[in-house]
Amino acid sequence: MSNVDPSLLILLVLAGLGIISHNMTVTLAMIFLLVIKITPLNQYFPLVEKYGMTIGILILTIGVMTPIATGRISAQEVFNSFLNWKSLLAIAIGIIVSWLGARGVSLMNNQPSTVAGLLVGTVIGVALFRGVPVGPLIAAGILSLLIGKS
């Protein structure tokens, strides 16, 4: 047992949390990382680490914008969003969250010691509280405000 890589155990535990909580996102993400780790694909970890967040944000953005692309949300509805107070509030909150996310990326790059706690908290939130794994960026942004760093 002393030859077991601790990161494998962490990924297995997190995959188990995903299974127990019926959270397919966490389960699949951990299995994906386990497969990469224990196969020759592990040579691509630097690429996944470097571009994974960008690719994830790209896929999330595509998913969010698809209703506009398909016409389910019309151009008129988009324009009308500037006339409704709830939509204007949503726009303002979107701006704030984007700003927090940018601060979060900066904090995670400049203070890598914060990453582990943010990731564990996010996975627990996703696995146990049905959260969505966009949390690390926003959490890091909020943390940067609290600790005065970016």
Curated annotation (Swiss-Prot):
Residue ranges of coiled coil: none
InterPro entries found in the cross-reference section: UPF0756_TM
Compartment annotation: Cell membrane
Keywords, ordered alphabetically: Cell membrane, Membrane, Transmembrane, Transmembrane helix
Predominant place of localization: membrane
Family, similarity comment: Belongs to the UPF0756 family.
Name by which UniProt lists this protein: UPF0756 membrane protein PMI1560
Organism: Proteus mirabilis (strain HI4320)
